[in-house]
């Protein structure tokens, strides 16, 4: 773990020098991709997962892993590597649900379908889909067809109607249409009509794409 911690500290020092007096969430853009040491981080991360056991570390000791996963939110290489190590993935998901950084949570939520323990994956999904962060919850909803297809219609209706993320509601509704299409729900036609009534441009474009696919032979 020491090698990985050293690489994480190098990244932190670079970010502090490059963006003084700013915290990660306030910098904006794809600033993390400007770091030239990611290959060393990736190598140290994979080495740690291969050589060490998550149960040998406390939550505080593993906090740097969550931090660096969150910072790799553009390429998602660390999250993908983590998802290929099931025991580690479960441990870090538990930690992520208690963390304050949504950039780690959405990456893990979007990889739940790859878990070997489907019961555990569904438990995580129920937590992530109700996450207070809009994007985390939306990415979790998109996992629903693979893990809990029988819950898609209920959650699609909830996402469509809820107003806790009013400024992002259009995207919430696009996700609802997507999952209804994925499970071939008989409710899809009703929600396509609702999209037309809504009238917002991205939502209309999403509905049009779905309608186009439904008109193809064999659809």
Regions found by a protein language model. Give the residues of each.
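Amphipathic alpha-helical scaffolding segments comprising HEAT/armadillo-like alpha-solenoid repeats
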Residues: 53-65, 85-98, 117-130, 149-163, ...
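Alpha-solenoid repeat junctions
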Residues: 70, 82-86, 112-117, 144, ...
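Alpha-helical oligomerization segments
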Residues: 168-219
């Amino acid at each position: 773990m020491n090698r990985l911690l050293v690489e994480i500290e190098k990244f932190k020092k670079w970010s502090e020098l490059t963006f003084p007096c700013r915290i990660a969430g306030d910098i904006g853009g794809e600033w993390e991709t400007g770091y030239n040491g990611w290959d060393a981080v990736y190598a140290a991360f994979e080495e740690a997962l291969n050589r060490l056991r998550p149960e040998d570390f406390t939550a505080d000791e593993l906090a740097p892993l969550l931090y660096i996963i969150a910072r790799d939110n553009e390429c998602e290489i660390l999250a993908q590597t983590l998802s290929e190590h099931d025991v580690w993935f479960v441990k870090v998901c538990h930690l992520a649900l208690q963390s304050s950084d949504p950039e780690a949570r959405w990456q893990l939520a979007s990889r739940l379908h790859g878990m070997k323990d489907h019961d555990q994956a569904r438990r995580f999904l129920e937590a992530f889909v109700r996450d207070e962060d809009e994007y985390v919850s939306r990415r979790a909803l998109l996992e629903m067809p693979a893990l809990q297809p029988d819950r898609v219609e209920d959650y699609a209706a909830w996402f469509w109607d809820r107003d806790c993320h009013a400024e992002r509601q259009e995207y919430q509704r696009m996700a609802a249409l997507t999952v209804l299409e994925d499970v071939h729900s008989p409710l899809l036609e009703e929600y396509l009509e609702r999209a037309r009534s809504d009238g917002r441009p991205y939502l209309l474009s999403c509905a049009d794409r779905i309608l186009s696919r439904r008109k193809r032979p064999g659809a």
